[in-house]
């Protein structure tokens, strides 16, 4: 059996587009991503505001698209793909993180899975008796659950960033499938999140023509992610067709032992869904970069108030008195609390920690992205030798953020699955 391959490269704004093309080919993506199938670029939006390390970067999305076009993939068969969560506004997020700029520049389709005429089918209709092998999803959803019909037969390229997570220690390729494959009741799986990620990988392997991941570590996030992190500039890119292996290598870079510290990696490794042992993974590209240890402290040393409460609800003393409410029409209280805490309180009060990052070359490239974008037909320019003079900015206006978060709060309450289900029953 051949070894799993993970490509690792150092990068800079001056070479990032060429680096993404080289990275993907080092990882053998053309052997995995079929040219005669639709290809979904699964964008990661962990926060609808720009925060370094939290979401798919514009140069990551742009680099992958240009690599695909350079290698002969038909742009009309490539689309960006977004899910919706009850606390994140995907439309705001794709604008604030400048992903929409990239998609529109290339003229690609932009699919929001929960909108328009998108069809969903029962998971058993898609995977058959494979569902009998699920570790936990049959218990979480005894009546089954729905997945997007369009995913069946499509390629998918995941676009995560390197960061920590308060539920899973790290998050990356495997976790990026969470929003796309599960509906808005995905929070029901949080108590068994590691087993859930393994079940979702089983589903992906059955329904997709090809599964590939391209991970951006230009910014990397430490601390109680995926939002409230301490970002660092790391200038590293990863790619692999093995979703377990790329998460293992990213975890090792951050300073974790993937088989010891990441239950979802260990479970997937033991089930032969991928390789989670770094000693058995073939690294191609920049071997020195792959040997780095960033000594991240992880998500649990300095948890936010919100993340501490989440742990108490899902795994601690509040599980019995509170968790049941998250599966009823009372659940929107948790969505409201999350939006108010993260958007109105944490974000405006913790911006000094990213000051240096915003002044980095990547921060300046982000700030100047609109005027720096290359023509969609330019597949030769390697990157941006001059990323621009001015640093990126976070939104500092407390009152405006508060007002915007109220708008997001209103949307999440209207679209909460518990409320929308009751509304559908009344109008049926």
Q: For the regions a protein language model found, what residue spans apply to each?
A:
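N-terminal and secondary-structure boundary signal
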Residues: 1-428
């Amino acid at each position: 059996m051949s070894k799993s391959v993970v490509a690792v490269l150092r990068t800079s704004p001056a070479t990032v587009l060429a680096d993404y093309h080289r990275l993907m080919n080092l990882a053998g993506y053309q052997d995995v991503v079929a040219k005669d199938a639709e290809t979904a670029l699964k964008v990661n939006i962990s926060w609808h505001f720009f925060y370094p390390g939290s979401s798919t970067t514009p140069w990551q999305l742009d680099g992958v698209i240009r690599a695909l076009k350079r290698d002969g993939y038909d742009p009309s068969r490539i689309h960006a793909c977004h899910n919706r969560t009850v606390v994140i506004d995907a439309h705001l997020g794709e604008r604030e993180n400048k992903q929409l700029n990239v998609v529109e520049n290339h003229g690609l389709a932009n699919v929001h899975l929960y909108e328009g005429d998108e069809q969903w089918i029962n998971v058993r209709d898609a995977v058959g008796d494979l569902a009998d092998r699920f570790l936990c999803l049959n218990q979480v959803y005894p009546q089954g659950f729905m997945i997007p019909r369009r995913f069946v037969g499509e390629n998918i390229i995941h676009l995560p960033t390197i960061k920590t997570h308060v539920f899973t220690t790290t998050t990356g390729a495997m976790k990026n499938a969470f929003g796309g494959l599960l509906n808005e009741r995905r929070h029901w799986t949080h108590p068994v999140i590691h087993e859930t990620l393994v079940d979702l990988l089983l589903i992906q392997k059955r329904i997709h023509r090809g599964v590939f991941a391209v991970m951006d570590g230009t910014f990397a996030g430490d601390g109680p992610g995926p939002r409230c992190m301490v970002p660092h500039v790391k200038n590293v890119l990863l790619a692999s067709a093995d979703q377990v292996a790329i998460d293992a290598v990213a975890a090792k870079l951050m300073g974790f032992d993937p088989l010891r510290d990441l239950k979802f990696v260990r479970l997937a490794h033991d089930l032969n869904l991928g390789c989670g042992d770094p000693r058995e993974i073939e690294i191609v590209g920049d071997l020195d970069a792959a040997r780095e240890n960033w000594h991240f402290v992880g998500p649990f040393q300095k948890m936010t108030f919100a993340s501490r409460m989440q742990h108490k609800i899902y795994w601690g003393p509040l599980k019995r008195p509170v968790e049941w409410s998250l599966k009823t029409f009372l659940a929107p209280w948790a969505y409201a609390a999350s939006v108010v805490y993260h958007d109105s309180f944490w974000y405006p009060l913790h911006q000094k920690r990213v000051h240096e990052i915003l002044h980095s070359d990547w921060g300046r490239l982000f700030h100047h992205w609109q005027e720096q974008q290359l023509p969609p037909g330019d597949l030769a320019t390697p990157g941006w030798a001059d990323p621009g003079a001015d640093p990126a900015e976070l939104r500092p206006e407390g009152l405006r953020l508060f007002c915007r978060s109220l708008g997001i709060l209103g949307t999440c309450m209207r679209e909460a699955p518990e409320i929308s289900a009751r509304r559908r029953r009344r109008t049926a």
